[in-house]
Curated annotation (Swiss-Prot):
Residues 1-20 form a transit peptide. The keyword DNA repair does not apply. It comes from Arabidopsis thaliana. This is Pentatricopeptide repeat-containing protein At2g01510, mitochondrial. Pfam families: DYW_deaminase, E_motif, Eplus_motif, PPR, PPR_2. Residues 490-584 are annotated as: Type DYW motif. Belongs to the PPR family. PCMP-H subfamily. PANTHER family: DYW DOMAIN-CONTAINING PROTEIN, PENTATRICOPEPTIDE REPEAT-CONTAINING PROTEIN. The gene is PCMP-H37. One of its GO terms (biological process) is RNA modification. Gene3D superfamilies: Tetratricopeptide repeat domain. One of its GO terms (cellular component) is mitochondrion. Residues 459-489 are annotated as: Type E(+) motif.
Length: 584
């Protein structure tokens, strides 16, 4: 590295640090020289070393260097905070903050954005609330960069009212603040709120940019709001906003999430530039919409064109195999990942969940259970949840009970797992077990997630809950629904009441089923929809067996395509047949 006769200077060591910035072993050798020669006394070389270590992610060694420093400046504290946040080490970040306060070091305006991010990563609301008090105490609450991070923290904790209040209270909201708020709304599943604030942003004459467009197209994709999304995209083009490949990929994703696969394929073919995200988006979109063979064909084309797939691409491929019941193909693709020398293609928990879903949906429940037990990674709730869902579909009460016991122990507050187990018992007629599950939910304070459906009409999104009568056209909706139910009963429709409470009369069971949110959304769509145009319904949970059967009959009765996206996948109902082929 250095000739023994060469006299060392601070400048030479600085140049060496710059040349070795991405080489951990070299950096440690230079560190030893700095300490031995006494150049560490004024911290300047250690500062450069610390910055390099943070960039390469060696936070343990970075902390060692930091602790050697004599009264490090606030810039160095912030550098370490930044490194901890970037490397997902929130607890270490909070310990550093505690040390900072114990030593009486005063934070500056750049300190708190990192510490707030650390608390968001940690998911500790009480700690976040306390930190907010510190921010106010030190007088940084009005600064845009700090307030923006606090807003994002509250959104991630589900404290919508606090986040909105804080955002509205910001004296100056620049484009960065607006974009951050809109993005976190979408990331936390609050896309309707994102659209509402986008309209406020436009009303306040804040000029949006390509980052805004990406967030809003993503929001429209989540909501199934194709018309609104296209309006936003057209407006962006008219205002000469840079609709780069990131924007085009977001538009592509929106069409696929709205079930508009044919238009998405046209957009894909017309793209002047395509990257791995473009290809992966199409493959995942095809899989989600039940076009599994198209997804796998596109994957082959992608490889033939010399593009390297990433882990998202393989998620789409495995999902396609799962939705089509292609067990052998799925196993083959998963083996490709396992045997790959590319670390970026090592299977993640999401891929293992896809494999469990594939085996489970195909009725290979015991094989799926054994697969989980032999996994090299610790199975999370997503993986066990996939198996429990399969047990519910195939009505395997014994294995379902085993899996539910694991889930209730690890995630007692997630009501959907309790509900799935309850449905398994209900399907088997074990009503005493159903009562025990519901009693346990009450004891734990676990609540079932409220189901809702939405449908877009003339640039407005209409939401419906079960038995909802708050809609201005509620009377007409229920009249239309009654009319449809009478007609499809004559066609052979019989309400599936097996999972409805056992201690109510049959008439009440049928009434409860007939007022499910997706039925109300479909009835509204039939009233307002244009002839020849599909009805697009978005459901936040898995659609029930009865609503699935109802949708098939309605598509046949009215010759209207119904495109429904539930929690698991898309269902394209055409002429009495669903694209899922009863596999959901």
């Amino acid at each position: 590295m250095l000739a023994k006769q060469t006299p060392l200077t601070k400048q030479m060591l600085s140049e060496l640090l710059r040349a070795s910035s991405s080489k951990p072993k070299q950096l440690k050798k230079i560190h030893a020289i700095v300490l031995r020669t006494g150049f560490s006394e004024k911290n300047s070389l250690l500062t450069q070393l610390l910055e390099n270590l943070v960039v390469i992610g060696d936070m343990c060694y970075a902390r060692q260097v930091f602790d050697e420093m004599h009264k490090p400046r606030i810039f160095l504290w912030n550098t370490l905070f930044k490194g901890y946040v970037r490397n997902q080490l929130p607890f270490e970040s909070l310990l550093l903050y505690k040390k900072m306060r114990d030593l009486g070091v005063r934070p500056d305006e750049f300190t708190y954005p990192f510490v707030v991010k650390a608390i968001s990563q940690l998911g500790d609301f009480s700690c976040g609330f306390a930190l907010h008090a510190h921010v106010v105490k030190y007088g940084f609450g009005c600064l845009g960069i700090v307030a923006t991070e606090l807003v994002m923290m509250y959104m991630k904790f589900g404290e919508l009212s606090s986040a909105e209040f804080l955002f509205e209270s910001m004296q100056v909201k620049d484009l960065v603040a607006w974009n951050a708020f809109l993005a976190v709304c979408v990331q936390t599943g609050n896309s309707a709120i994102a659209l509402e604030y986008f309209n406020k942003m436009c009303a306040d004459a804040v000029q949006f940019d390509s980052f805004t467009v990406v967030s809003m197209l993503s929001a429209c994709g989540q909501l199934g709001s194709l018309e609104i999304g296209e309006e936003i995209y057209d407006r962006a083009r008219k205002e000469e906003i840079d609709c780069n490949i990131i924007v085009e990929n977001a538009r592509l994703d929106m069409h696929l999430k709205c079930g508009n696969t044919e238009a998405a394929r046209v957009l894909f073919e017309e793209m002047k530039q395509r990257n791995v995200v473009s290809w992966s988006t199409m493959i995942v979109g095809y899989a989600m919409n039940g076009d599994s063979r198209e997804a796998l064909t596109l994957f082959t084309t992608m490889q033939n064109e010399g593009l390297r797939p990433n882990y998202v691409t393989f998620l789409g491929v495995l999902s396609a195999c799962s939705h089509a019941g292609l067990v052998n193909e799925g196993k083959r693709y998963f083996s490709l990942m396992v045997q790959s020398n590319d670390k970026n293609l090592e299977p993640r928990k999401e891929h293992y969940a896809c494999m469990v879903d594939l085996l489970g949906r195909s009725g290979l429940l015991e094989e799926a259970y054994e697969f989980i037990k032999k996994m090299p990674v610790e199975p999370d709730t997503g993986i066990w949840g996939a198996l429990l869902g399969a047990c519910a579909v195939h009505r395997d009460m014994i294995l379902g009970q085993k899996v539910a016991d694991v889930l209730v122990e690890t995630a007692p507050d997630i009501g959907s797992y309790h509900v799935l187990l309850s449905n398994i018992y209900a399907a088997a007629g074990k009503w005493d077990c159903v009562d025990k599950v519901r009693s346990k939910m009450r004891k734990l304070g676990t609540k079932k997630v409220a189901a809702y459906s939405s449908v877009e009409f003339e640039g407005k999104i209409h939401f419906f809950n079960r038995g909802d009568k708050s809609h201005p056209q509620s009377k007409a909706i229920y009249e239309k629904l009654d009319e449809i139910l009478k007609k499809i009963r004559k066609m052979g429709y019989v309400p599936d009441t097996c999972s409805v409470f056992h201690d109510v009369e049959m008439e009440e069971k049928e009434c409860s089923l007939s007022h499910h949110s997706e039925k109300l959304a479909i009835a509204f769509g039939l009233i307002k929809g244009r002839p020849g145009h599909p009805i697009r319904v978005m459901k936040n949970l898995r659609t029930c067996d009865d609503c699935h059967a109802f949708s098939k009959f309605v598509s046949s009765l009215t010759s209207t395509e119904i495109i429904m996206r539930d929690k698991n996948r898309f269902h394209h109902f055409r002429n009495g047949v669903c694209s899922c082929k009863e596999f959901w």
